[in-house]
Regions:
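Conserved catalytic core of the tyrosine transesterase superfamily
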Residues: 1-169
Length: 169
């Protein structure tokens, strides 16, 4: 493959230049193989519909949200209640790929389902608080400035885990 050939060539160039102290750049110009750019594999709309039809519950909502908004999987998993803006149909993605923040759309056809999911999260959070739980991880600086923020509804995960766990910190 192209990457294997490039790695071997770079190893030889390193050997000659840094170990043997022979500079080959002036004497030879090796032919470098190019990577072949393959087009991405994309599902047809009918395949997507069949996939969604085979799913149900929270995984189906997550898949539809990822597909409809262009989010990455971990961005969806890390989504918090306060990151959903129903007024402007926006989703705020914090700390996405490359640590960057960005904004994407909340698909119109998922508004009601997302609203029900957030209402379920609020109810679950209320029950957790009554039982002495309900804290979520928040950035340390924020936790110092607002000690009770980790218990607020806005910081709760939109798609919480099924099992309750306690943050060891």
């Amino acid at each position: 493959s192209a990457s294997t050939q490039r790695q071997a060539l770079n190893a030889i160039v390193f050997l000659y230049k840094n170990v043997l102290d022979i500079h080959l750049e002036d004497k030879i110009t090796p032919a470098r193989s190019k990577r072949t750019a393959s087009p991405p594999t994309v599902m047809t709309p009918s395949e997507v519909q069949r996939l969604f039809a085979a799913m149900e519950g929270k995984p189906a909502l997550m898949a539809k949200l990822i597909y409809g908004s262009g989010m990455r999987l971990m961005e969806c998993i890390r989504l918090r209640v306060q990151d959903i803006d129903f007024g402007q149909n926006l989703i705020f993605i914090r700390g996405g790929k490359g640590g960057k923040d960005r904004t994407t759309i909340l698909p119109q056809n998922l508004r009601d389902e997302m609203f029900r999911q957030i209402e379920a999260v609020k109810s679950l959070h209320h029950n957790d608080l009554e039982e002495g739980f309900g804290d979520v991880y928040i950035p340390e600086a924020l936790a110092r400035k607002y000690p009770k923020a980790s218990r607020s509804t806005g910081w709760q995960w939109v798609f919480p885990a099924k099992l309750r766990s306690v943050d060891p910190r």
